[in-house]
Amino acid sequence: AGIDAGGPHLYETDPSGAMMAYKAGGIGAGRNEVMEVFEKEYKDNMSEAQAVTLGLKGLSAANENNLKPEVVEIAIINPEKEFHTLNSDEVAKAVKKVK
C-alpha cells in the first residue's frame, strides 16, 4: 500500500504469486466480512473521515460488532503523502461512530 504521483495504490499477492489491485481490502481472519462491507459501501473520492469510518465498519463486521478501541490503530497517508496516526482519543471517537 502506498501513494505516489499516480494516486493511492493497494495490492495483494496471493500464494500463487498473482498480484491483485484493490481500492479497499482486508486480509486474514474476517476478510470475507470486511470485503463484503467494502464492496457495498466503498465510494471513490471518500473523505478521510469517511474512509476511516468504512475501515472500522469492516473491522467491526469481522469482529461480530464487538470492536474495542484499545486494540485499534489507525494510520493515514493523505494525497500530499503525509503520514500520521490517530491518537487513542481520536480512535475511540471514530470507533464509537460505528457502534
Report residues per predicted region.
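Long, low-complexity N-terminal extensions
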Residues: 1-99
